[in-house]
UniProtKB/Swiss-Prot annotation:
Source organism of the structure: Acanthamoeba polyphaga mimivirus (APMV)
The protein's name in its UniProt record: Uncharacterized protein L116
Highest taxon above the source species: Viruses
Family, per entry: Belongs to the mimivirus L41 family.
Region (Disordered): 30-303
Positions with biased composition (Basic and acidic residues): 36-56, 101-115, 123-276, 282-303
Bias kind Polar residues: ranges: 61-72
Length: 563
């Protein structure tokens, strides 16, 4: 800057030689702006010395004022080019020399000095020169999405799914399925990661392998000891030691169990002692016969007695003649009857004879708790005299002969309370004279012959009024004369009491078939499907006219379809 200062001063002095100095100062130096700068007293001494050493610069009054002796920051001169140079280099004042110390004070920058400071930072010095107050979005350390330390999805330390320490599925320490120590399916004896010498009496609450939720005492599904796939030998050994029902003190349990057993045994002995049945069995058979002959005409059990008076007896302990004590009353059974009964778990009563359900005298052999009555003969449901063998209150009646549904005289073998009638012959649905074997309450009828759907005379075997008609021959859907074997009926949506023929299907011996290149399925929407021997060939969507023609012809030939 000193050399630049000298250069401008010499140029200015050369211009003063041609122009009067007094005139120039009065007219040209009106725009001089003097800005004082506060500097310490120590810095003034070197300035005075420098002015004494340079006597040639004294006549330049435009730059250093004689009255103030203060530096001038800017000077406006008549030459325009020179003013431009002054604008590009605004500070013409001589700056003080730097101190000799190593710490050099940085120059103060003001808004008047229109300077642009450009600093070049290398890659090595970037981390040192970066400002600590930088934007939170530009800093890779503070960015929420770019920072590897704060990012939820990219950080390997905080990521929930990628962290091997926190991941539930990948961590070998926390994984439920991979950990050999916590695995639900791996037995501790079969696992090759665990040693067999580990103590079995480890703490249940301090061990990391038996946490609060996976403890074999608290968890029913995760414990390897209680696993369903464990072996039977291991389950028996370990379940006994870790059963929920066992208390902490085994000695108390044993003592309680022994006391309960003793009390039960004593109570049983006491209860069995006063029973008169044992006393009667100890007596001789002659005494039994004498007692029976004396009391049989008066106290012998009759069939008309209410069933609540009887009790259950095991079949093995039934003697020829015995007595039973119940509610301070005695009942006797004679040897001639040879029929006994028992109560089952549901409260029903059954009569037996020679190890088979049987009861004579046209009486029910089974009486259930809901009131159902069944008649048996030699172990088979049977009742003669055209009477029902099974009577279910509120449901219906059934007729049986020798264990099969049967009724003679063209009468239904099953009559339901809702109006359903079914005809059977020797256990098979059957009815002769072209009559339906099943008649339901809704009016639908079904024809059977020897247990098979069948009806001759080109008549439908299944009739559901207003729904469909089906033709069967020997149990197969079939109809001859190129007529549909299934005709569906649908109700007109706008007309309440009007019906129309819907879809039509042609069958031959149980398979969809129609010869002559005609469709085997004709829908009411006009879609045609072609079949041969049950195999579908193709379909045609343009068949509305064909449907109308076929439906109208069927209504004319078979008027009962829409009745």
């Amino acid at each position: 800057m000193d050399s630049l200062y000298k250069w401008f001063s010499t140029i200015y002095q050369g211009k003063d030689t041609c122009i009067d100095q007094d005139v120039f100062l009065s007219t040209e130096i009106q725009s001089i702006e003097i800005q004082p700068e506060e500097k310490p007293s120590e810095e003034k001494q070197p300035e005075e010395k420098s002015s004494e050493e340079k006597p040639k610069l004294q006549p330049v009054s435009a730059i250093n004022s004689e009255k103030t002796q203060k530096p001038i920051s800017s000077v406006a001169l008549p030459n325009e080019d020179f003013n431009k140079l002054l604008y590009n280099f605004p500070s013409l004042s001589r700056r003080p020399q730097p101190k000799t110390t190593t710490e050099r004070p940085q120059p103060k920058t003001t808004m008047d000095d229109k300077q642009v400071v450009v600093t070049f930072i290398t890659e090595r010095g970037r981390s040192c020169e970066l400002s600590s107050e930088r934007s939170r979005y530009r800093s890779p350390e503070r960015s929420r999405y770019r920072s590897p330390e704060r990012s939820r999805y990219r950080s390997p330390e905080r990521s929930r799914y990628r962290s091997p320490e926190r991941s539930r599925y990948r961590s070998p320490e926390r994984s439920r399925y991979r950990s050999p120590e916590r695995s639900h399916y791996r037995s501790p004896d079969r696992s090759h990661y665990r040693s067999h010498n580990k103590s079995t009496e480890r703490s249940h609450y301090r061990s990391t392998e038996r946490s609060r939720y996976r403890s074999p005492e608290r968890s029913h599904y995760r414990s390897p000891e209680i696993s369903r796939k464990r072996s039977r030998d291991e389950s028996r050994e370990k379940s006994l030691g870790r059963s929920r029902k066992m208390s902490r003190d085994e000695s108390r349990e044993k003592s309680l169990n022994e006391s309960h057993k003793r009390s039960r045994d004593e109570s049983q002995e006491k209860s069995y002692e006063p029973r008169p049945a044992k006393k009667l069995r100890e007596k001789s058979p002659d005494e039994h016969q004498e007692k029976h002959q004396e009391k049989s005409p008066e106290k012998q059990v009759e069939i008309t007695k209410p069933l609540e008076d009887y009790i259950a007896l095991p079949k093995e302990n039934v003697p020829d003649v015995f007595e039973i004590e119940k509610s301070q009353s005695t009942r006797y059974f004679s040897e001639k009857a040879r029929i006994y009964f028992k109560n089952t778990h549901d409260g029903s009563i059954v009569w037996y004879k020679d190890d088979a359900i049987h009861r004579d005298g046209d009486l029910p052999a089974v009486i259930e708790s809901d009131g159902t009555v069944k008649y048996y003969r030699d172990g088979k449901i049977h009742r003669e005299g055209d009477k029902p063998a099974i009577i279910i209150p509120g449901k219906g009646k059934s007729w049986y002969l020798d264990g099969k549904l049967h009724r003679d005289g063209d009468e239904p073998a099953y009559v339901s309370n809702d109006g359903t009638l079914k005809w059977y012959r020797h256990g098979l649905l059957h009815r002769e004279n072209d009559n339906p074997a099943i008649i339901n309450l809704d009016g639908s009828m079904v024809w059977y012959v020897d247990g098979k759907l069948h009806r001759g005379g080109d008549l439908p075997a299944i009739i559901k009024p207003g729904i469909c008609f089906k033709w069967y021959v020997n149990g197969h859907v079939h109809r001859d004369n190129d007529l549909p074997a299934i005709i569906n009926i649908f109700k007109m949506p706008k007309l309440c009491n009007m019906y129309r023929i819907g879809d039509m299907v042609w069958y031959q011996h149980g398979q969809r078939h129609r010869s002559g290149g005609k469709p085997a399925i004709v829908t009411f929407r006009g879609v045609l499907f072609y079949f041969e021997n049950g195999r579908r060939i193709y379909e045609s969507p343009n068949g509305k006219e064909y449907y109308n023609m076929t439906a109208n012809k069927l209504m004319m030939d078979f008027p009962y379809l829409l009745e």
